[in-house]
Amino acid sequence: LPKRDDRRRETILEIARDVFMMQGFAATSMSAIATRLGGSKGTLYNYFKSKEELFGAVVSRECAGLAASLFENVPPDGEMRQRLTHFGRVILSRLLEDGPIRLQRIIVAETERFPEIGAAFYESGPRQIQDRLSAYMAADIAAGRLSEADPRIAAAQFKDLVLSNIHQQKLWGV
């Protein structure tokens, strides 16, 4: 896509994200998004074949951005404890923000009808986080800073320990 088309696509994704977050997936129409955009449904369909495809693109974009932000400013060669503490604080604070929680609720509600939305969420969010954290763990194991272990299991256990029940309580509003 030319740069102008890239900018237009990004604008569509930003506006669609806002509308989906306010109204949820089921209550959002392409007409409502087009109205907020100041364009036509035809413009939306030039970029996305369906509301589901548009929502999938919103989910992928939001998750990729969130996953990347979790690894900003991680001390590259610092003490393992320092890096894990930093990551734990960031993941806990970012995943408990209202936006990510709201997005997860929408995804959970729609995944049964549209499994590709759940897959897009998993691949661009949780899987990316798992892969990057596993890479950190593998490097620490190789450098002798962490006991021999399966880095994927260690990463999953660490993430789950950090989030514990707090994430579930926030997600379910209790």
Can you describe what each PLM-predicted range is?
Residues G56-F87, S93-L95, G99, L103, ...:
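Amphipathic alpha-helical linker/stalk segments
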Residues L1-G39, Y47-E53:
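Basic, helix-initiating cap at the start of DNA-binding domains
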Residues E62, L66-L70, G99, P115, ...:
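Short amphipathic alpha-helical interaction/hinge segments
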Residues A119, I141-V174:
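Hydrophobic/aromatic-rich alpha-helical bundle segments in the mid-to-C-terminal region
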Residues S50, R113-P115:
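Short loop-to-helix capping motifs
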Residues S93, R102, I106-V108, E116-A142, ...:
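Amphipathic alpha-helical packing segments from all-alpha helical-bundle domains
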Residues G42:
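Key DNA-contact positions within bacterial/archaeal DNA-binding proteins
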Residues R9-E10, M30, E52, G56, ...:
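Short, structured helix-loop boundary elements
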